[in-house]
UniProtKB/Swiss-Prot annotation:
It catalyses: Hydrolysis of Ala-|-Gly bond in repressor LexA. Disulfide bonds: none annotated. SUPFAM superfamilies: LexA/Signal peptidase, Winged helix' DNA-binding domain. The keyword Transcription regulation applies. This is LexA repressor. Keywords: Autocatalytic cleavage, DNA damage, DNA repair, DNA replication, DNA-binding, Hydrolase, Repressor, SOS response, Transcription, Transcription regulation.
Length: 211
């Protein structure tokens, strides 16, 4: 049994609500979002999502819809998900301030609607610091990263300097590469010729957890 378009849309709504606010939407909120007259239709669609292994519901608990972790969802269930739902690992933290170590992983996977990002990201990183504040990127945000080594001057990139990673505005001139903050309280990073420098990916959107 495959998911209908409306069931895929409800799954996306639940996913985005949990990732943004930390809790699932209520059945009344789902009904309102889709123009249902009451929660009975919502309950039917939630029954299907639970049967297909996409969610689980905590009995007698308000906002008790839970997404099943990726490792709990079998391959058949994954195949039934909408192509517009991205399954993205959170690989760790990236500095919007001073570079931080690149070996920090969270070990999480989240489901997100593709519409939040352009181009489609390959993974998420959690921002630490506020050097990109004027680009609307704040401490604690999850940023989508499109994995590529190709970038142009003026793009926001995730870059590796030696064994550290950072998110900055890339500025390439004839004789130097700079990583520019978007906050006047921070100084640009000049990439030296003796440093191991690489572009890890392009910034392609963000998710802001409720806090």
């Amino acid at each position: 049994m495959s998911l209908s378009d409306i069931q895929q849309a409800i799954l996306s709504l639940i996913t985005n609500h949990i990732n943004a606010d930390g809790v699932s939407p209520s059945q009344t909120e789902i009904a309102r979002a889709f123009g249902f007259k009451g929660v009975r239709a919502v309950q039917h669609h939630l029954d299907v999502l639970e049967q297909q292994g996409m969610i689980r519901r905590v009995p007698r608990q308000a906002r008790g819809i839970r997404l099943k972790h990726l490792t709990e969802v079998d391959e058949t269930a994954l195949a039934l998900q909408s192509e517009d739902v991205l399954r993205l690992p959170v690989l760790g933290r990236v500095a919007a301030g001073q570079p931080i170590g690149a070996d920090i992983g969270e070990g999480r996977v989240v489901l997100l609607d593709r519409v939040f990002f352009s181009p489609a990201p390959d993974y998420l990183l959690r921002v630490q610091g506020d050097s990109m504040r004027d680009e609307g990127i704040f401490d604690g945000d999850l940023i989508g990263v499109h994995r590529t080594q190709d970038a142009h001057s003026g793009q926001i990139v995730v870059a590796r300097i030696d064994d550290e990673i950072t998110v900055k505005l890339l500025k390439i001139s004839k004789d130097r590469i700079r990583l520019l903050p978007r906050n006047p309280d921070f100084a640009p990073i000049e990439v030296r010729s003796d440093q191991d420098f690489a572009i890890e990916g392009l910034y392609c959107g963000l998710l802001r957890p409720n806090r």
